C-alpha cells in the first residue's frame, strides 16, 4: 500500500468524522432550540429504562452542564449519584418530564441546574 493511498484513506476517514460531528451538533442545536418537549422523548425513555438508581443517591437533573459532568461520580464520592442531564433542555422540559426525571429511591438530595438554555436567543 502506498503512502498516498494511506493518506487518502485517512483523509476520507477524517471527512466522515467531521460530517458525523457536524450532523450531531446540528441535531443537538435543533433539539435545544425546540419549544416542543417531545424532542427529548428518547433521552427520557433511556432514563426510565435505567430505573431509580441506588437508594440514598444524589440525584442530578438538568441540561448539558449536568449531562457532560464527566467526573460527577468521582467528584461526589463516596455518595452514589444519578445523572439525569439532557443537554439543551429548558425549565419547561424538566417540568414536563418531572415524573420520570425525579424517580429515585429515597434520594439524599436533588440538584437541579437548568435554565441557561431558556436565555438562548432563537
What label would you give each PLM region?
Residues 64-65, 85:
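Catalytic nucleophile serine of serine hydrolases
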Residues 84-90:
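Short beta->alpha junction loops
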Residues 59-61, 82, 110:
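Conserved beta-strand elements of the Class I
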Residues 66-80, 92-122:
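Oxyanion-hole/transition-state-stabilizing segment in secreted/luminal serine hydrolases
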Residues 34, 88, 122:
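Charge-dense, low-complexity intrinsically disordered segments
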Residues 1-60, 70, 74:
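N-terminal secretory targeting modules
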Residues 19, 23, 27, 46, ...:
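Low-complexity, compositionally biased segments
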Residues 43-48, 91-97:
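N-terminal post-signal-peptidase region of extra-cytosolic proteins
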Amino acid at each position: 500500500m502506498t503512502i498516498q493511498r494511506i493518506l487518502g484513506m485517512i483523509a476520507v476517514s477524517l471527512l466522515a468524522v467531521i460530517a458525523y460531528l457536524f450532523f450531531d451538533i446540528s441535531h443537538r442545536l435543533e433539539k435545544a432550540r425546540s419549544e416542543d418537549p417531545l424532542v427529548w422523548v428518547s433521552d427520557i425513555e433511556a432514563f426510565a429504562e435505567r430505573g431509580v438508581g441506588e437508594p440514598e443517591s444524589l440525584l442530578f437533573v438538568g441540561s448539558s452542564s449536568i449531562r457532560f459532568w464527566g467526573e460527577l461520580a468521582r467528584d461526589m464520592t463516596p455518595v452514589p449519584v444519578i445523572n439525569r442531564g439532557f443537554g439543551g433542555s429548558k425549565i419547561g422540559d424538566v417540568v414536563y418530564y418531572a415524573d420520570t426525571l425525579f424517580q429515585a429511591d429515597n434520594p439524599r438530595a436533588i440538584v437541579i441546574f437548568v435554565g441557561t438554555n431558556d436565555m438562548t436567543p432563537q
